[in-house]
């Protein structure tokens, strides 16, 4: 995720992507989302438009939820206060906002309630209105209230036929808040180069869990993906929609899959971008993704080598990687000092790998340049030289290493730890870290490290498993270092009626409306327009983003 003016810092491992994008471990400079025009593939057939829904259906009646499904939403200004520039931007874009009341505990619908913030950019082509599409930007813990204007642009002509609805999941963003009071913005650090770093991490992660327990004792048990899916269904009912369409990125693909399993028959068109197979969803989210991250780093190193005159990191891939290794080794000997008074940061070997990890989820030139600038600053610090920070790098470090945006990290941990249990014994993590070092010395100690879930109460519900087919559209890049292509393909196999759009040779997390690939955008928009999945799985090239896709045999 990258920093941005609209979404704030909502990402899990870095500043939040523009428009509230909060994608799972995706940190990169904000993109000026240029959507390339593409022709609608001929493999689609038109479907009849759906009229605007009238009253909410009676789904939920008999289980105490009827009053939530039938609530009247008070749509109005999105501005929450005098400093709410994002709210003013939404108002200017024609977006309206409201709060949806949901039960804290769905087992006790007459008990305590909380609110979930929603935003809506209404369809302007009312004669051909299709319905409403609900957005989730991942994270977990990412916001989406600020996303409808951007998604409307990505959807092109079909966007005018939808009510585009963003929401901030329970305890996220503009919804009923939870702030654990963390001293850092994320829990996802490396174990470092030795036992001392790991022991510091054990103490930190226990402290983070304890802080959340102290701040949110009455709500933590009710923060989970399954409860967010239940909130989504209340939103659907409150909007008056019999079925709702859905666009989810990263973790949002897991949330979307959970919704299809919990509420079959209540969804229409579902797009899952950068998908997570339910079996891959675990407390250590990135465990097993070390090869993809190392390939992404290696590809970035080759790119940086071609720009040695600009960044001075090495003239070959091997030289750039040696520079990176030297930085990590120096940080293990003692923290690296970057920045200048009054803003100075000291980064050790539990933090430097995080910076590298955050920078490789986007292979655009802009993102790669930003990472090169960050590595250049770290290289200077490793040599004991002054290492001034760019505004973007300073913002990223403030997010990760201070409490400036601590609420984001705390809620993300609450969602993950509320979903899935984790080993309690720190030695389990240490053994995994040590086993990973030989093959993956840089990222193994990060992806296998302990986190707050080791000290969390056990989840109230079991993880959701796929037991029903769902005709969804999955979008994935072969080199995605966050939600790996293996996971997207795995979800595709679990859902025989799904179709998979593959972007080859891209180290990119998050494609639709973000990557400028006209093939991807065209396929997704055709599906949203017609409700018809492509007849076959499709492959899109990165060589000419605005060109048509090439077809491949279905892997169903």
Go through each PLM region and give its residues.
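Catalytic histidine-centered segment of alpha/beta-hydrolase-like enzymes
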Residues: 507-518
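Alpha/beta-hydrolase fold active-site neighborhood
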Residues: 63-65, 322-470, 513-515
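Conserved alpha/beta-hydrolase "acid-adjacent" motif
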Residues: 481-486
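Alpha/beta-hydrolase fold nucleophile elbow
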Residues: 241-251
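Catalytic-loop region of hydrolases
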Residues: 2-7, 14-30, 37, 41-195, ...
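Conserved acidic catalytic loop of the alpha/beta-hydrolase fold
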Residues: 211-218, 229-243
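Conserved strand-to-loop "acid loop" that flanks and positions the catalytic carboxylate
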Residues: 473-479
């Amino acid at each position: 995720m990258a920093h941005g003016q609209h979404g704030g810092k909502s990402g899990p491992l870095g500043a939040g992507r523009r428009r509230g994008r909060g994608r799972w471990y995706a940190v990169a400079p904000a993109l000026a989302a240029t959507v390339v025009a593409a022709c609608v593939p001929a493999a689609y057939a038109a479907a009849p438009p759906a009229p605007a829904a009238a009253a909410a259906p009676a789904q939920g009646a008999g289980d105490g939820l009827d009053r939530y499904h039938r609530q009247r939403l008070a749509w109005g200004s999105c501005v929450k206060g005098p400093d709410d520039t994002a709210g003013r931007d939404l108002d200017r874009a024609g977006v309206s906002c409201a709060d949806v009341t949901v039960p804290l505990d769905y087992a006790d619908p007459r008990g305590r309630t909380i609110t979930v913030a929603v935003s809506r950019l209404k369809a302007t082509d009312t004669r051909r209105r299709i319905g409403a599409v609900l957005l989730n930007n991942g994270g977990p813990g990412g916001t989406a209230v600020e996303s409808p204007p951007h998604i409307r642009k990505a959807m092109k002509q079909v966007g005018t036929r939808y009510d585009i609805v963003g929401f901030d999941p329970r305890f996220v963003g503009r919804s009923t808040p939870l702030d654990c009071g963390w001293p850092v913005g994320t829990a996802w650090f490396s174990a470092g180069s030795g036992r001392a770093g790991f022991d510091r991490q054990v103490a930190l992660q226990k402290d983070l869990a304890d802080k959340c327990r102290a701040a949110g004792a009455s709500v933590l048990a009710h923060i989970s993906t399954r409860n967010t899916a239940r909130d989504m269904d209340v939103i659907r009912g409150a909007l008056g929609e019999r079925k709702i369409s859905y666009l989810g990125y990263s973790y949002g693909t897991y949330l979307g899959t959970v919704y299809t399993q919990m509420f079959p028959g209540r969804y229409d068109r579902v797009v899952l971008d950068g998908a997570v197979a339910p079996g891959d969803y675990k407390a250590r989210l990135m465990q097993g993704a070390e090869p993809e991250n190392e390939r992404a780093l290696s590809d970035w190193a080759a790119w940086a080598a071609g720009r040695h005159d600009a960044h001075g990191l090495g003239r070959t891939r091997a030289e750039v990687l040696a520079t990176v290794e030297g930085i990590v080794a120096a940080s293990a000997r003692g923290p690296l000092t970057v920045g200048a008074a009054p803003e100075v940061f000291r980064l050790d070997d539990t933090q430097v790998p995080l910076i590298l990890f955050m920078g490789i989820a986007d292979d655009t030139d802009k993102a790669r340049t930003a990472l090169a600038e960050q590595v250049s600053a770290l290289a200077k610090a490793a040599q004991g030289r002054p290492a001034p920070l760019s505004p973007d790098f300073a913002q990223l470090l403030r997010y990760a290493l201070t409490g400036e945006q601590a609420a984001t990290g705390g809620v993300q941990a609450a969602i993950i730890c509320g979903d899935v249990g984790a080993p309690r014994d720190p030695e389990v993590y240490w053994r995994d870290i040590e086993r990973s070092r030989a093959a993956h010395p840089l990222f193994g100690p990060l992806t296998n490290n302990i986190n707050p879930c080791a000290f969390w109460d056990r989840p109230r519900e079991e993880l959701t498993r796929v037991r029903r087919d769902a005709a969804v559209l999955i979008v994935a890049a072969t080199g995605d270092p966050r939600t790996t292509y293996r996971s997207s393909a795995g979800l595709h196999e679990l859902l025989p009626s799904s179709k998979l759009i593959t972007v080859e040779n891209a180290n990119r997390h998050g494609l639709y409306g973000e990557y400028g690939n006209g093939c991807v955008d065209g396929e997704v928009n055709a599906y949203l327009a017609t409700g018809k999945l492509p007849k076959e799985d499709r492959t899109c090239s990165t060589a000419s983003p605005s060109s048509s896709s090439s077809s491949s045999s279905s892997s169903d």
